[in-house]
Curated annotation (Swiss-Prot):
It catalyses: (2R)-3-phosphoglycerate + ATP = (2R)-3-phospho-glyceroyl phosphate + ADP. GO terms for cellular component: cytosol. Its EC number is 2.7.2.3. Substrate binds at D21, L22, N23, R36, H59, L60, G61, R62, R113, R146. One of its GO terms (biological process) is gluconeogenesis. Keywords: ATP-binding, Cytoplasm, Glycolysis, Kinase, Nucleotide-binding, Transferase. PROSITE patterns: PGLYCERATE_KINASE. Belongs to the phosphoglycerate kinase family. The lineage of its organism: Bacteria, Pseudomonadati, Pseudomonadota, Gammaproteobacteria, Pseudomonadales. It comes from the Bacteria. Pathway: Carbohydrate degradation; glycolysis; pyruvate from D-glyceraldehyde 3-phosphate: step 2/5. This is Phosphoglycerate kinase. GO terms for molecular function: ADP binding; ATP binding; phosphoglycerate kinase activity. PANTHER family: PHOSPHOGLYCERATE KINASE (PTHR11406), PHOSPHOGLYCERATE KINASE 1, CHLOROPLASTIC-RELATED (PTHR11406:SF23).
Amino acid sequence: MTVLKMTDLDLAGKRVLIREDLNVPVKDGVVKSDARILASLPTIKLALEKGAAVLVCSHLGRPEEGVYSEEDSLAPVAAYLSKALGREVPLVKDYLGGVEVKAGELVLLENVRFNKGEKKNSDELAQQYAALCDVFVMDAFGTAHRAQGSTHGVAKFAKVACAGPLLAAELEALGKALDKPARPMLAIVAGSKVSTKLDVLNSLADICDSLIVGGGIANTFLAAAGLPVGKSLYEADLVDTAKAIAAKVSVPLPVDVVVAKAFAEDAEATVKSVKDVADDDMILDIGPQTAQQFAEMLKASQTILWNGPVGVFEFDQFGNGTKALALAIAESPAFSIAGGGDTLAAIDKYGVSEQISYISTGGGAFLEFVEGKVLPAVEVLEQRAK
Protein backbone atom coordinates (compact mmCIF):
# COMPACT_ATOMS: atom_id res chain seq x y z
CA MET A 1 0.00 0.00 0.00
CA THR A 2 1.76 3.11 -1.23
CA VAL A 3 0.49 6.53 -0.23
CA LEU A 4 2.24 9.89 0.12
CA LYS A 5 2.82 10.73 3.78
CA MET A 6 2.53 14.15 5.35
CA THR A 7 5.69 13.47 7.35
CA ASP A 8 7.70 13.30 4.09
CA LEU A 9 6.50 16.64 2.69
CA ASP A 10 7.88 20.16 2.98
CA LEU A 11 4.92 22.17 4.29
CA ALA A 12 6.67 25.50 4.97
CA GLY A 13 4.46 28.38 3.82
CA LYS A 14 1.89 25.97 2.36
CA ARG A 15 -1.85 26.03 3.02
CA VAL A 16 -2.58 22.62 4.52
CA LEU A 17 -6.13 21.29 4.90
CA ILE A 18 -6.30 18.41 7.40
CA ARG A 19 -9.38 16.17 7.57
CA GLU A 20 -9.58 14.87 11.12
CA ASP A 21 -12.28 12.83 12.85
CA LEU A 22 -13.43 15.24 15.56
CA ASN A 23 -16.90 13.70 15.80
CA VAL A 24 -16.98 13.67 19.61
CA PRO A 25 -19.92 13.53 22.03
CA VAL A 26 -20.96 17.02 23.11
CA LYS A 27 -23.46 17.86 25.85
CA ASP A 28 -24.61 21.38 26.73
CA GLY A 29 -21.81 22.82 24.61
CA VAL A 30 -19.06 20.83 26.36
CA VAL A 31 -16.96 18.00 24.88
CA LYS A 32 -17.71 14.83 26.88
CA SER A 33 -15.08 12.45 25.46
CA ASP A 34 -11.89 13.91 24.05
CA ALA A 35 -10.14 10.75 22.75
CA ARG A 36 -10.50 11.66 19.06
CA ILE A 37 -9.38 15.25 19.62
CA LEU A 38 -6.32 14.09 21.57
CA ALA A 39 -5.46 11.62 18.79
CA SER A 40 -5.49 14.46 16.23
CA LEU A 41 -3.25 16.88 18.18
CA PRO A 42 0.17 15.46 17.12
CA THR A 43 -0.76 15.84 13.42
CA ILE A 44 -1.96 19.43 13.89
CA LYS A 45 1.13 20.36 15.95
CA LEU A 46 3.47 18.79 13.39
CA ALA A 47 1.91 20.76 10.52
CA LEU A 48 2.31 23.98 12.54
CA GLU A 49 5.93 23.11 13.41
CA LYS A 50 6.61 22.58 9.72
CA GLY A 51 5.54 26.19 9.10
CA ALA A 52 2.20 25.51 7.42
CA ALA A 53 -0.95 27.62 7.40
CA VAL A 54 -3.28 25.01 8.87
CA LEU A 55 -7.00 24.50 8.24
CA VAL A 56 -8.67 21.61 10.06
CA CYS A 57 -12.03 20.16 9.04
CA SER A 58 -14.34 17.44 10.37
CA HIS A 59 -17.97 16.39 10.65
CA LEU A 60 -19.91 16.20 13.90
CA GLY A 61 -23.21 14.40 14.43
CA ARG A 62 -25.80 13.93 11.74
CA PRO A 63 -27.25 17.34 10.90
CA GLU A 64 -29.61 17.84 7.98
CA GLU A 65 -27.18 18.43 5.13
CA GLY A 66 -26.79 22.02 4.03
CA VAL A 67 -28.51 23.36 7.16
CA TYR A 68 -26.67 24.97 10.11
CA SER A 69 -27.64 23.64 13.53
CA GLU A 70 -26.11 24.89 16.75
CA GLU A 71 -26.12 21.46 18.42
CA ASP A 72 -23.90 20.05 15.65
CA SER A 73 -21.55 23.04 15.52
CA LEU A 74 -17.83 22.42 16.06
CA ALA A 75 -17.70 25.47 18.41
CA PRO A 76 -17.11 23.29 21.53
CA VAL A 77 -14.29 21.52 19.68
CA ALA A 78 -12.71 24.87 18.73
CA ALA A 79 -12.87 25.88 22.41
CA TYR A 80 -11.29 22.58 23.44
CA LEU A 81 -8.50 22.91 20.84
CA SER A 82 -7.78 26.50 21.95
CA LYS A 83 -7.29 25.27 25.52
CA ALA A 84 -5.28 22.17 24.56
CA LEU A 85 -2.93 24.08 22.25
CA GLY A 86 -2.69 27.23 24.38
CA ARG A 87 -3.63 29.45 21.44
CA GLU A 88 -6.86 30.78 20.00
CA VAL A 89 -8.33 28.49 17.35
CA PRO A 90 -10.96 30.49 15.45
CA LEU A 91 -13.99 28.63 14.06
CA VAL A 92 -14.66 29.71 10.46
CA LYS A 93 -18.29 29.39 9.36
CA ASP A 94 -18.20 30.57 5.74
CA TYR A 95 -15.08 29.20 4.13
CA LEU A 96 -15.99 27.75 0.73
CA GLY A 97 -15.10 31.03 -0.99
CA GLY A 98 -11.63 31.06 0.63
CA VAL A 99 -10.00 31.63 4.02
CA GLU A 100 -7.14 33.93 5.02
CA VAL A 101 -4.63 31.90 7.05
CA LYS A 102 -0.97 32.81 7.49
CA ALA A 103 1.94 30.40 8.02
CA GLY A 104 1.98 29.24 11.64
CA GLU A 105 -1.73 30.00 12.09
CA LEU A 106 -4.50 27.48 12.70
CA VAL A 107 -8.24 27.65 12.02
CA LEU A 108 -11.03 25.11 12.44
CA LEU A 109 -13.60 24.99 9.64
CA GLU A 110 -17.24 24.54 10.64
CA ASN A 111 -18.92 21.11 10.32
CA VAL A 112 -18.46 19.83 6.75
CA ARG A 113 -21.94 18.29 6.88
CA PHE A 114 -23.41 21.81 6.87
CA ASN A 115 -22.25 21.94 3.21
CA LYS A 116 -24.64 20.70 0.54
CA GLY A 117 -23.12 17.83 -1.42
CA GLU A 118 -20.78 16.58 1.35
CA LYS A 119 -22.40 13.16 1.73
CA LYS A 120 -23.05 12.75 -2.01
CA ASN A 121 -19.35 13.48 -2.66
CA SER A 122 -20.22 16.30 -5.05
CA ASP A 123 -17.35 17.26 -7.37
CA GLU A 124 -18.32 20.93 -7.15
CA LEU A 125 -17.97 20.95 -3.34
CA ALA A 126 -14.80 18.83 -3.47
CA GLN A 127 -13.22 21.39 -5.84
CA GLN A 128 -14.12 24.19 -3.41
CA TYR A 129 -12.38 22.28 -0.59
CA ALA A 130 -9.36 21.63 -2.83
CA ALA A 131 -9.10 25.34 -3.69
CA LEU A 132 -8.56 26.12 0.01
CA CYS A 133 -5.22 24.31 0.14
CA ASP A 134 -1.88 23.45 -1.45
CA VAL A 135 -1.80 20.11 0.41
CA PHE A 136 -4.73 17.97 1.55
CA VAL A 137 -4.04 15.63 4.48
CA MET A 138 -6.45 12.75 5.13
CA ASP A 139 -5.98 11.79 8.78
CA ALA A 140 -9.44 10.48 9.70
CA PHE A 141 -9.30 6.69 9.53
CA GLY A 142 -12.74 6.50 11.18
CA THR A 143 -14.34 8.01 8.05
CA ALA A 144 -12.05 6.41 5.44
CA HIS A 145 -14.75 3.90 4.47
CA ARG A 146 -17.05 6.73 3.35
CA ALA A 147 -16.66 8.35 -0.06
CA GLN A 148 -17.66 11.90 0.86
CA GLY A 149 -16.60 15.37 -0.21
CA SER A 150 -14.14 16.01 2.63
CA THR A 151 -12.70 12.46 2.74
CA HIS A 152 -12.54 11.35 -0.90
CA GLY A 153 -13.62 14.05 -3.36
CA VAL A 154 -11.15 16.69 -2.15
CA ALA A 155 -8.28 14.20 -2.51
CA LYS A 156 -9.05 13.88 -6.24
CA PHE A 157 -8.71 17.61 -6.86
CA ALA A 158 -6.15 18.92 -4.32
CA LYS A 159 -2.70 19.79 -5.76
CA VAL A 160 -1.18 17.25 -3.35
CA ALA A 161 -3.09 14.59 -1.36
CA CYS A 162 -1.42 12.58 1.40
CA ALA A 163 -2.01 10.49 4.52
CA GLY A 164 -1.58 12.08 7.94
CA PRO A 165 0.42 10.36 10.71
CA LEU A 166 -2.71 8.95 12.39
CA LEU A 167 -4.05 7.38 9.19
CA ALA A 168 -0.58 6.12 8.19
CA ALA A 169 -0.08 4.48 11.61
CA GLU A 170 -3.50 2.84 11.40
CA LEU A 171 -2.82 1.39 7.93
CA GLU A 172 0.60 0.16 9.04
CA ALA A 173 -0.76 -1.55 12.18
CA LEU A 174 -3.64 -3.21 10.32
CA GLY A 175 -1.28 -4.30 7.55
CA LYS A 176 1.06 -5.84 10.12
CA ALA A 177 -1.82 -7.80 11.68
CA LEU A 178 -3.50 -8.92 8.46
CA ASP A 179 -0.95 -9.11 5.63
CA LYS A 180 1.87 -11.13 7.15
CA PRO A 181 0.91 -11.88 10.75
CA ALA A 182 3.41 -13.49 13.11
CA ARG A 183 2.07 -16.94 14.03
CA PRO A 184 0.09 -18.17 15.81
CA MET A 185 -2.56 -15.56 15.10
CA LEU A 186 -5.71 -15.42 17.19
CA ALA A 187 -8.76 -13.22 16.68
CA ILE A 188 -11.59 -12.45 19.08
CA VAL A 189 -14.83 -11.49 17.36
CA ALA A 190 -17.78 -10.83 19.61
CA GLY A 191 -21.10 -9.11 19.16
CA SER A 192 -24.80 -9.78 19.26
CA LYS A 193 -25.22 -11.16 15.75
CA VAL A 194 -23.32 -13.40 13.33
CA SER A 195 -25.17 -11.62 10.49
CA THR A 196 -23.58 -8.22 11.20
CA LYS A 197 -20.06 -9.67 11.48
CA LEU A 198 -20.34 -12.42 8.86
CA ASP A 199 -17.80 -10.88 6.45
CA VAL A 200 -15.36 -10.27 9.32
CA LEU A 201 -15.70 -13.87 10.54
CA ASN A 202 -15.21 -15.29 7.04
CA SER A 203 -12.25 -13.04 6.30
CA LEU A 204 -10.51 -13.86 9.61
CA ALA A 205 -11.26 -17.59 9.25
CA ASP A 206 -8.97 -17.50 6.19
CA ILE A 207 -6.12 -15.72 8.04
CA CYS A 208 -6.24 -16.88 11.67
CA ASP A 209 -5.03 -20.00 13.41
CA SER A 210 -7.80 -19.70 16.03
CA LEU A 211 -10.98 -17.66 16.25
CA ILE A 212 -12.59 -16.97 19.63
CA VAL A 213 -16.24 -15.93 19.33
CA GLY A 214 -18.22 -14.16 22.05
CA GLY A 215 -21.62 -12.69 22.85
CA GLY A 216 -24.64 -13.62 20.73
CA ILE A 217 -22.23 -14.81 18.02
CA ALA A 218 -20.88 -17.49 20.38
CA ASN A 219 -24.43 -18.64 21.16
CA THR A 220 -25.04 -19.34 17.47
CA PHE A 221 -21.82 -21.40 17.37
CA LEU A 222 -22.88 -23.27 20.53
CA ALA A 223 -26.24 -24.07 18.92
CA ALA A 224 -24.37 -25.25 15.80
CA ALA A 225 -22.46 -27.69 18.02
CA GLY A 226 -25.74 -29.04 19.38
CA LEU A 227 -25.36 -27.40 22.80
CA PRO A 228 -28.29 -25.79 24.68
CA VAL A 229 -28.51 -21.98 24.65
CA GLY A 230 -31.77 -21.53 26.61
CA LYS A 231 -33.40 -18.19 25.86
CA SER A 232 -30.09 -16.57 24.88
CA LEU A 233 -29.84 -14.35 21.83
CA TYR A 234 -28.81 -16.47 18.83
CA GLU A 235 -29.59 -16.80 15.11
CA ALA A 236 -31.14 -20.16 14.24
CA ASP A 237 -30.98 -19.42 10.50
CA LEU A 238 -27.19 -19.00 10.66
CA VAL A 239 -26.35 -22.27 12.40
CA ASP A 240 -25.16 -23.81 9.10
CA THR A 241 -23.03 -20.72 8.43
CA ALA A 242 -21.41 -21.13 11.86
CA LYS A 243 -20.70 -24.79 11.06
CA ALA A 244 -19.05 -23.78 7.76
CA ILE A 245 -16.80 -21.23 9.53
CA ALA A 246 -15.88 -23.76 12.24
CA ALA A 247 -14.88 -26.19 9.47
CA LYS A 248 -12.35 -23.63 8.13
CA VAL A 249 -10.66 -22.53 11.36
CA SER A 250 -10.32 -23.67 14.96
CA VAL A 251 -13.20 -22.09 16.95
CA PRO A 252 -12.74 -23.09 20.63
CA LEU A 253 -16.13 -23.12 22.36
CA PRO A 254 -16.79 -22.27 26.02
CA VAL A 255 -16.79 -25.17 28.50
CA ASP A 256 -18.60 -23.09 31.12
CA VAL A 257 -20.76 -19.97 30.96
CA VAL A 258 -22.30 -17.35 33.24
CA VAL A 259 -26.09 -17.30 33.01
CA ALA A 260 -29.00 -15.30 34.41
CA LYS A 261 -32.78 -15.50 34.25
CA ALA A 262 -33.05 -11.88 33.03
CA PHE A 263 -30.95 -9.24 31.27
CA ALA A 264 -30.63 -6.69 34.06
CA GLU A 265 -28.04 -4.84 36.10
CA ASP A 266 -29.18 -6.59 39.28
CA ALA A 267 -29.62 -10.05 37.70
CA GLU A 268 -28.09 -12.90 39.68
CA ALA A 269 -25.13 -14.50 37.90
CA THR A 270 -24.70 -18.29 37.99
CA VAL A 271 -21.76 -20.26 36.57
CA LYS A 272 -22.78 -23.45 34.75
CA SER A 273 -21.23 -26.10 32.56
CA VAL A 274 -22.12 -25.28 28.97
CA LYS A 275 -24.05 -28.58 28.81
CA ASP A 276 -26.31 -27.59 31.74
CA VAL A 277 -27.85 -24.38 30.36
CA ALA A 278 -31.58 -24.46 31.20
CA ASP A 279 -34.42 -23.45 28.89
CA ASP A 280 -35.00 -20.20 30.81
CA ASP A 281 -31.29 -19.27 31.10
CA MET A 282 -29.62 -16.41 29.22
CA ILE A 283 -25.87 -16.77 28.57
CA LEU A 284 -24.30 -13.38 29.42
CA ASP A 285 -20.58 -14.20 29.79
CA ILE A 286 -17.99 -16.97 29.49
CA GLY A 287 -17.24 -18.91 32.68
CA PRO A 288 -13.97 -18.82 34.69
CA GLN A 289 -12.65 -22.12 33.28
CA THR A 290 -13.21 -20.94 29.71
CA ALA A 291 -11.69 -17.54 30.50
CA GLN A 292 -8.56 -19.28 31.80
CA GLN A 293 -8.27 -21.51 28.71
CA PHE A 294 -8.73 -18.56 26.33
CA ALA A 295 -6.24 -16.47 28.37
CA GLU A 296 -3.58 -19.20 27.97
CA MET A 297 -4.18 -19.21 24.19
CA LEU A 298 -3.79 -15.43 24.07
CA LYS A 299 -0.53 -15.52 26.02
CA ALA A 300 0.84 -18.09 23.55
CA SER A 301 -0.11 -16.03 20.47
CA GLN A 302 2.14 -13.79 18.37
CA THR A 303 -0.63 -11.73 16.72
CA ILE A 304 -3.98 -10.84 18.30
CA LEU A 305 -6.90 -8.98 16.74
CA TRP A 306 -9.66 -8.07 19.20
CA ASN A 307 -13.11 -6.87 18.21
CA GLY A 308 -15.84 -7.05 20.81
CA PRO A 309 -16.25 -7.94 24.51
CA VAL A 310 -17.15 -11.59 25.25
CA GLY A 311 -19.81 -10.76 27.85
CA VAL A 312 -22.15 -8.02 29.02
CA PHE A 313 -19.24 -6.27 30.77
CA GLU A 314 -21.30 -3.13 31.49
CA PHE A 315 -22.80 -5.22 34.34
CA ASP A 316 -19.88 -6.19 36.60
CA GLN A 317 -21.16 -9.69 37.36
CA PHE A 318 -20.98 -10.48 33.61
CA GLY A 319 -17.65 -8.73 33.00
CA ASN A 320 -15.13 -11.24 34.36
CA GLY A 321 -14.64 -13.00 31.02
CA THR A 322 -13.88 -9.79 29.15
CA LYS A 323 -11.63 -8.62 32.00
CA ALA A 324 -9.64 -11.89 31.99
CA LEU A 325 -9.10 -11.69 28.22
CA ALA A 326 -8.17 -7.98 28.36
CA LEU A 327 -5.53 -8.71 31.02
CA ALA A 328 -4.23 -11.73 29.06
CA ILE A 329 -3.86 -9.61 25.90
CA ALA A 330 -2.01 -7.01 27.99
CA GLU A 331 0.39 -9.71 29.27
CA SER A 332 0.85 -11.43 25.92
CA PRO A 333 4.07 -10.79 23.94
CA ALA A 334 1.90 -10.67 20.79
CA PHE A 335 1.43 -7.72 18.47
CA SER A 336 -2.13 -6.81 19.46
CA ILE A 337 -4.63 -4.60 17.68
CA ALA A 338 -8.06 -3.73 19.06
CA GLY A 339 -10.97 -1.87 17.51
CA GLY A 340 -14.68 -1.14 17.82
CA GLY A 341 -16.52 1.13 20.27
CA ASP A 342 -17.45 -1.52 22.85
CA THR A 343 -13.92 -2.91 22.75
CA LEU A 344 -12.46 0.52 23.49
CA ALA A 345 -14.87 0.94 26.41
CA ALA A 346 -13.70 -2.42 27.82
CA ILE A 347 -10.03 -1.43 27.38
CA ASP A 348 -10.75 1.78 29.33
CA LYS A 349 -12.68 -0.04 32.05
CA TYR A 350 -9.89 -2.56 32.69
CA GLY A 351 -7.03 -0.06 32.26
CA VAL A 352 -5.02 -1.95 29.63
CA SER A 353 -4.67 0.71 26.91
CA GLU A 354 -0.90 1.07 27.44
CA GLN A 355 -0.30 -2.67 26.97
CA ILE A 356 -2.14 -3.04 23.66
CA SER A 357 0.13 -2.51 20.66
CA TYR A 358 -2.38 -0.56 18.60
CA ILE A 359 -5.89 0.69 19.35
CA SER A 360 -7.84 1.50 16.19
CA THR A 361 -9.82 4.74 16.17
CA GLY A 362 -12.18 3.63 13.41
CA GLY A 363 -15.26 1.52 14.12
CA GLY A 364 -16.86 0.85 10.73
CA ALA A 365 -13.62 1.52 8.85
CA PHE A 366 -11.74 -0.93 11.08
CA LEU A 367 -14.26 -3.69 10.34
CA GLU A 368 -14.35 -2.98 6.60
CA PHE A 369 -10.55 -3.09 6.42
CA VAL A 370 -10.54 -6.43 8.29
CA GLU A 371 -13.19 -7.69 5.84
CA GLY A 372 -10.74 -6.95 3.03
CA LYS A 373 -12.87 -4.16 1.57
CA VAL A 374 -11.33 -1.22 -0.24
CA LEU A 375 -11.59 2.01 1.77
CA PRO A 376 -12.44 4.79 -0.75
CA ALA A 377 -10.45 7.51 1.05
CA VAL A 378 -7.36 5.29 1.11
CA GLU A 379 -7.80 4.11 -2.48
CA VAL A 380 -7.83 7.69 -3.79
CA LEU A 381 -4.59 8.46 -1.88
CA GLU A 382 -2.98 5.41 -3.50
CA GLN A 383 -4.10 6.60 -6.94
CA ARG A 384 -2.71 10.10 -6.29
CA ALA A 385 0.64 8.64 -5.17
CA LYS A 386 1.24 7.00 -8.57
